[in-house]
């Protein structure tokens, strides 16, 4: 699926399914629970990450708009992290 969003406050959340994401446009940061945005590198076009289901994480778009391709192993959902 293609997803686009602009800058917004990051929220720690979880998904049921694993996913793989490729940044197509813009610059982002992605981090796991226990880290902060300051702990991780900026991810630009071509950057990739694998996110295990059930693992709390957050991400933020640092550009006017970010576009990503996401491949899910199952149902697409999102819930606030415990």
Label the predicted regions.
Residues 9-10, 20, 38-39, 59, ...:
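A short local loop/turn or secondary-structure capping micro-motif enriched for an aromatic residue
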Residues 8, 27, 54, 73-75:
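Solvent-exposed coil/turn segments that connect beta secondary-structure elements
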Residues 1-2, 10-15, 32, 40, ...:
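Short histidine-centered beta-strand/loop micro-motifs
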Residues 21-22, 48-51, 60, 67-70:
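Structural recognition of the beta-strand scaffold that forms the well-ordered cores
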Residues 58-82:
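Double-stranded beta-helix
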Residues 5, 33-55, 62:
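Short acidic-glycine-tyrosine-enriched beta hairpin
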